[in-house]
């Protein structure tokens, strides 16, 4: 049981970091677009 857990954790962390990175880029794009439109 202790085998699959550590193996699965890095993949989950990688996916979460990727998701947060995309979210951050999206938020930055929205902020920049609103700034330029203003």
UniProtKB/Swiss-Prot annotation:
GO terms for cellular component: chloroplast thylakoid membrane; photosystem II reaction center. It is found in: Plastid, Chloroplast thylakoid membrane. It comes from the Eukaryota. Keywords: Chloroplast, Membrane, Photosynthesis, Photosystem II, Plastid, Reaction center, Thylakoid, Transmembrane, Transmembrane helix. InterPro entries: PSII_PsbL (IPR003372), PSII_PsbL_sf (IPR037266). It is a single-pass membrane protein. The keyword Transmembrane applies. The keyword Transmembrane helix applies. The chain crosses the membrane at residues 17-37. One of the components of the core complex of photosystem II (PSII). PSII is a light-driven water:plastoquinone oxidoreductase that uses light energy to abstract electrons from H(2)O, generating O(2) and a proton gradient subsequently used for ATP formation. It consists of a core antenna complex that captures photons, and an electron transfer chain that converts photonic excitation into a charge separation. This subunit is found at the monomer-monomer interface and is required for correct PSII assembly and/or dimerization. This is Photosystem II reaction center protein L. It comes from Rhodomonas salina (Cryptomonas salina). The lineage of its organism: Eukaryota, Cryptophyceae, Pyrenomonadales, Pyrenomonadaceae, Rhodomonas.
């Amino acid at each position: 049981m202790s085998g699959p857990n550590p193996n699965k954790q890095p993949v989950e962390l990688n996916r979460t970091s990727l998701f947060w990175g995309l979210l951050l880029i999206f938020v930055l794009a929205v902020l920049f677009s609103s700034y330029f439109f203003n």
